[in-house]
Amino acid sequence: MTHRGIEVKSDQIKVINNLQPPQNPKEVQKLSGMMAALNRFISRSANRCRPFFLLLHKWKEFEWSKECVVAFQQLKQYLSCLPIMSNPVLDKIIFAYIAVAFYAISFVLIWVDNGIQRPVYYVSKLFNEAEVRYLPLEKAILAIVYATRKLPHYFQAHTVVVLTQLPFKSILRSADYTGRIAKWGTILGVFDIKYMPRVSIREKFSPI
């Protein structure tokens, strides 16, 4: 924490930049642990690190592929210019963006301080085998549910406006849905979450 906001210590970045490509799953696990400590600052961290995560259990078939090489280089480049995060003022409205990929979801919270968008927290998650088969709309709702579990204190202390073109409001309140969507609707219903079109605010820190 500095006078500018919440910043990553330069030593943390230096350690990762000096890392050589992992040679086995244990070294990948070490890298994953380092990245976990920085997840708050990294947009789409699950997408960026997915090539590494896929190697975590491949002791016999471990191969640092070209995809891993590119992802590792791009990650180091991204870490050279991480955003400064900020804690929102109590009772201020927080805005949220969602990004859905085939194998991951990403979520970012921001708040507006005197007209300036300030990022609060990035959240990202790789889907498990069952979640990969969800419909795109279900994946998007899951992103919000996951964020409430990961960052409950923000959702409890603030109104959160999710900026999206998806019809979340009507779907989550519809009596026609059962199963997981109905369950998610109940989970989200305890928070003050609103849904507005993405054009409602100029996008600067969208996770896409």
For the regions a protein language model found, what residue spans apply to each?
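Acidic, metal-ion-coordinating active-site neighborhood of RNase H-like domains
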Residues: 1-208
